[in-house]
Amino acid sequence: MLAEQKLAELISDALEGLAQDIAVEAHASIGGLYDGDEVAAIRERTIHYLGGLAESLRQNDPDIFLAPVEQGVRGRLANGFTALSILSYADTAEAALLRLAANASGDPYERNRYIMSIRAMIGRSRSLITNTSKQWLAEQKTEAEQKAEGKQPTA
């Protein structure tokens, strides 16, 4: 029970840290650039991505987070986060991760393996989402600049 409580704290702290990091990143990169509809669309893509993670966890497959990142996974990555979207996911993720750890509770080596999988998932998610967000935002800015140049009258 004490080990599960410690694991719950680890997961909760990691998810809260991830939520804070991504909320700061989203406000810095998205704030002021997009209107409410565009931010809502980004939030929907975020929920879709997190739903995919939750489904993988429900299938008791933590190794998916240790595998090389495939193009299909990148295609589902959200272009930004809001604190609300990830915090609404945290309860589902925490419950699923605790079930994974409970499955390995008989073997300390396996429990540690699951904890490392969780850490890898959170670290990889933070890195991929941040990098993908920055790349996507740069592409959007370039497209907007090109459209603006195309609309300007030529002298």
Please state what every model-predicted region is.
Residues 1-84:
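N-terminal low-complexity or simple alpha-helical regulatory segments
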